[in-house]
Amino acid sequence: GEVRGFVYDKSTSEPVLFTTVFLDGTNFGISTDINGYFSITKVPAGTYTLKVSSVEYADFNKEITIQANKIITERIELEESNVQLDEVTISGKKIAAQENIQVAISTVKPREIKIMPSVGGEPDLAQYIQTLPGVVFTGDQGGQLYIRGGSPVQNLILLDGLLVYNPFHSIGLFSIFDTDILKNVDIYTGGFNAEYGGRTSAVIDVTTKDGNKNRFSGKVSANPFTSKLTLEGPITKKENGGGTSFVLSGRTSYLDRTSEVFYDYVETENGLPYSFNDIYGKVTSTSSQGSKFSAYGFNFSDRAGLDSSSTFGWDQYGVGAQFIFLPSGSSQLISGTAGYSSYDIGIQEATQSPRSSQVSSFNFGLDFTYFISKSEIKWGIQYVGNSTSYNTVTPNRIVIEENQNNTEMAGYGKVRFVQSRFVIEPSLRLQYYASLGLLSLEPRIGGKLNITDDFRFKAAGGYFTQNLIATRSDRDVVNLFAGYISSPGSLFDENRQSVEDKIQKSTHYIAGFELDLFRDKVEINVEPYIKIFNQNININRLKVFADDPDFIVEEGQSSGVDFQ
């Protein structure tokens, strides 16, 4: 038989993530996923005590009866607890550590961001992410993020499954993500599985909460930099636990006005010339069984006055929808995402011609997940159609204009095998670049060996490709403007020979270990890594004549050891 369901916070009806659900006295157990979902399969018929343990919540116990070839669906609500962790909770954390590979990934919860000292009293992901190993952040030089040697354009940024092209404001202290509406942030610094594609370095996967389904609440805050308003609450309620809820967040900055008062030592004519506005809204409808549908939208903008005669700015907006469907009588979970996003950027300088760029994308994905005992099979299809434009004039007065439409299609599959002492997750991605007529076969693998209960060895690796190119050279650290284009029609290597394969490529190798000390009170994580950038495409800074190539091919390698 099978027992499955969702785990929720009783006070808000928000899903409880990554908590351990198990049958007491057995080896049957699993952690909830990003949606609070769990599925324990292949359970012999009988009566069991279903237990849920979590760091933040009181333990949950319920007696259930499982019948052969039958599926039980449970809706579990946990109450918050301030009681010190007991052995059951510690055991749950240990199970999760042993059964989740966790190579080159940092999972960030909102509470971790909020307890960290922040600039201006406003906790933000942009400030937190700088504390992570392997991350280099340029801060007030445009907020560019370099992860284990990869450039910013090589990072895949997702907001509720929607493509985002610039997650940080120009001042660098703030991201576009309001901490009060975040549910979870997964940061993959390398070696990510085949579920993610189209980028060669890293992934930042941001998920927002659905909104409080039980009561209305709001928050107004202000500091010398920004002010914001957050609202959430139920739209409709159902006695059986389902309903519709919303969450709305708006934030504006006024640093360009307040800096003249608070920071009079700044040697600029009009204080600090930065301003931005962020708006995000989401509506979610959930059934009593846990299936749900969400619709959301955002609008982010940023402005910077570089000097009295230069202006810079970008606008980013998008709309999308997600669903989770739990078929009755089936051991699978079906989920999907569809949406449209757009990013426009421009700069006007007194000594140069205007530069501008625009990228817009429609993306669609459909995923199927099957649970077999502790193991998992997941596969899906993805589609991205984008258009890019880039307009600039070089210092030598050569006009560069690039306008392209591209289509990327992908299918992936991954299998996670969980045994008593090891976990292995091979995956494969087929990425088709329709505009280039190129099919890329991208194998990935990750694994963990539990040498003892407290010492675990882990490793991951894979092959990655991408088509998107940034017009900012990696050698320009201080440069707010970055246009986006797809692979150019003509491309040459250092010997001026034509390059037929016009995608960017990288290979990742990661290995390391985890060590728990003093009854799990101290956790040590060490990860050596190598990223080989087999083919990078960069703007040609040495272009002098019209027939010189606009872009050149480069190679690179990044290596190091991360301690956490």
Describe each region flagged by the PLM.
Residues 199, 250-254, 292, 331-350, ...:
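Surface-exposed extracellular loop regions of Gram-negative outer-membrane beta-barrel proteins
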Residues 225-254, 265-303, 311-335, 370-377:
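Transmembrane beta-barrel wall of Gram-negative outer-membrane proteins
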Residues 313-320, 327, 344-347, 353-423, ...:
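Outer-membrane beta-barrel transmembrane domain signature of Gram-negative proteins
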Residues 172-175, 183-193, 203-234, 248-252, ...:
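Short strand-turn segments of transmembrane beta-barrel domains in outer membranes
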Residues 338-339, 493, 499-553, 557:
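Membrane-embedded beta-barrel scaffold of Gram-negative outer-membrane proteins
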Residues 1-87:
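Periplasm-facing N-terminal accessory domains of Gram-negative outer-membrane beta-barrel systems
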Residues 218-224, 248-254, 295-299, 336-342, ...:
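Transmembrane beta-barrel strands of outer-membrane/channel proteins
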Residues 58, 65-70, 91, 95-153, ...:
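Periplasmic N-terminal accessory/gating domains of Gram-negative outer-membrane beta-barrel systems
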